[in-house]
């Protein structure tokens, strides 16, 4: 059987194109499984996985837990709010204490960029990065590009624009890496204050006019404004942001083609996207959620296969 070139999923930038192809091929099989009446397979009955979330999460945490249980793994859920981390325990000590209970794999979300990379060098377990600060969110990028492949047949050659708060978004960076690795052309669009200075170094197009960006693209991935990561104001008001960078039905109808609308969630309805767009046939937002389980099953299964060797 083919195997991944990595022992951890720390970020898209560590993957090869063949790794993504293998994850997608495996996800295709698991998507068929999760649509059966009996949605469980016994693949990981001998694997224990700990979910360590040091930041709040709903969809990602539930998606990982469901993926793990669909594979029949034993699952431990860890909440930083009720842990010894609050008493000053270090990340390495926390994880090593958990691993001493014979845990094989750690899924971690952490506010500090690079936390997963740091951990992978100090503990003896497979690490999956479920989001590290404003750095990367690899499984989100995988499920996003998998959803594009499912909808349009291929990612290669497609024009994809990522709209919104690029500066604070781990989703944006991972998507840029994943899209480029699969041969897509990438543009970012948002207020200049929410575009990082290094963005052009990533080989992407930059546009501050939303209408022009949408006319160029095949797919628009709409990001929310991450107010929780902002210590200053980056635009005059939410109303003004919506007027310039919010997608509504009127704007989509003014285009000379039909584009695909995506959103990683949570959606701020009426801000970056209106309800009639979010709930329209052009939007594949719920497909992304469904595909997230299959993608995470694939990642966990492929990494666990390397543990078993």
List each model region and its residues.
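A short helix->loop->beta-strand "cap" motif at the edges of active sites that frequently abuts
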Residues: 125, 183-185, 254-260
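Rossmann-like adenosine-cofactor binding region
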Residues: 199-276
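Positively charged, low-complexity intrinsically disordered leader regions
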Residues: 1-66
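Phosphate/diphosphate ligand-binding glycine-rich loop within oxidoreductases
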Residues: 38-146, 269
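Adenosine-phosphate binding glycine-rich loop
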Residues: 258-259, 264-309
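Glycine-rich phosphate/diphosphate-binding loop of Rossmann-like nucleotide-binding domains
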Residues: 54-66, 150-224
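Phosphate-coordination loops involved in phosphoryl transfer and adenosine-cofactor binding
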Residues: 44-49, 156-160, 258
């Amino acid at each position: 059987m083919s195997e991944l070139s990595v022992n951890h999923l720390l970020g898209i930038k560590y993957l090869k194109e063949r790794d993504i192809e293998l994850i997608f091929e495996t996800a295709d099989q698991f998507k068929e499984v999760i649509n059966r009446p009996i949605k469980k397979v016994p693949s990981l009955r001998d694997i224990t996985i700990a979910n360590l979330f040091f930041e709040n999460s709903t969809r990602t945490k539930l998606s990982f837990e469901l993926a793990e249980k669909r594979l029949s793994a034993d699952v431990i859920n860890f909440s930083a709010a009720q842990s010894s981390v609050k008493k000053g325990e270090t990340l390495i000590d926390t994880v090593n204490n958990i691993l001493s209970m014979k845990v094989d794999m750690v899924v971690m979300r952490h506010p500090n960029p690079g936390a997963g990379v740091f951990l992978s060098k100090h503990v003896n377990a497979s690490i999956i990065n479920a989001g590290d600060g404003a750095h990367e969110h690899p499984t989100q990028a995988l499920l996003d590009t998998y959803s594009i492949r499912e909808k349009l047949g291929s990612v290669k050659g497609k024009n994809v624009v990522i709209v919104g708060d690029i500066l604070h978004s781990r989703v944006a960076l991972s998507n840029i890496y994943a899209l480029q690795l699969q041969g897509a052309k990438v543009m970012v669009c948002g207020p200049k204050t929410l575009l990082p200075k290094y963005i052009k170094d990533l080989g992407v197009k930059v546009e501050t006019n939303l209408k022009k960006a949408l006319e160029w693209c095949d797919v628009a991935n709409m990001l929310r404004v991450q107010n929780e990561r902002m210590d200053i104001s980056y635009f005059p008001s939410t109303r003004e942001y919506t007027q310039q960078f919010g997608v509504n039905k009127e704007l989509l109808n003014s285009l000379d083609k039909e584009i695909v609308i995506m959103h990683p969630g949570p959606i701020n309805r009426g801000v970056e996207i209106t309800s009639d767009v979010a709930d329209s046939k052009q939007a594949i937002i719920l497909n992304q959620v469904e595909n997230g389980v299959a993608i995470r099953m694939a990642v966990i299964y492929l990494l666990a296969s390397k543990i078993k060797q």
